[in-house]
A protein has these predicted regions:
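Alpha/propeptide regions of enzymes that mature by internal proteolysis
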Residues: 1-170
Length: 170
């Protein structure tokens, strides 16, 4: 028996891909990473990964964490930039004996040295939304944030092991 749950509708396609893995006896760790990568790669989610909204300076800074329920290992990145899949970096960091949480430039440098894909995460769509928001701020005509935020995934595999992951464009 296996199981999986994720936050928000935006994770649906990733959960379906991960479901195939779990049905094929894959590990919960692979399932969590697969599900979250699907969300990170989709350019129309403005709160996670590629297409996520940039910060005040126009830079897409992302956060991700990965936790292994069997070993209690954790890996995390915060403020990472120009990396295609922060969840994959966080997962690899969970296997590091020391310094399993990297922030900002240190997170990005770790990812580049480890061979992760460098990618400009700012899409034209996200840039336009950001520019509109800057104009609203200047005009003091603000509305509450519209949309969902961080994606979170929990998976249990057929070996009764559990893993958890989360990703956000901060």
């Amino acid at each position: 028996m296996w199981g999986m749950i994720a936050t928000w509708r935006m994770a649906h396609d990733g959960v379906l891909a991960a479901k195939e893995l779990l049905e094929g006896q894959a590990s919960c760790k692979d399932a969590v990473e697969t599900a979250i990568k699907a969300v990170e790669d989709y350019p129309f989610y403005k709160s996670v990964g590629y297409g996520g909204l940039p910060n005040e300076r126009g830079i897409v800074e992302m956060d991700a964490a990965f936790m292994d329920g069997e070993t209690f290992k954790i890996g995390a990145v915060a403020g990472i930039t120009d990396v295609a899949n922060p969840i994959s970096v966080a997962r690899q960091l969970s296997d590091e004996k020391f310094n399993s949480f990297r922030v900002g430039q240190g997170a990005t440098e770790y990812a580049m040295l480890a061979g992760f894909e460098r990618k400009n995460m700012l899409t034209d769509r996200a840039k336009k939304i950001w520019e509109k928001r800057l104009a609203e701020i200047a005009a003091s005509n603000l509305d509450p944030y519209d949309g969902h935020d961080t994606v979170g995934v929990v998976a249990l595999d057929t070996q009764q092991q559990m893993a958890v992951g989360t990703s956000s464009s901060g």
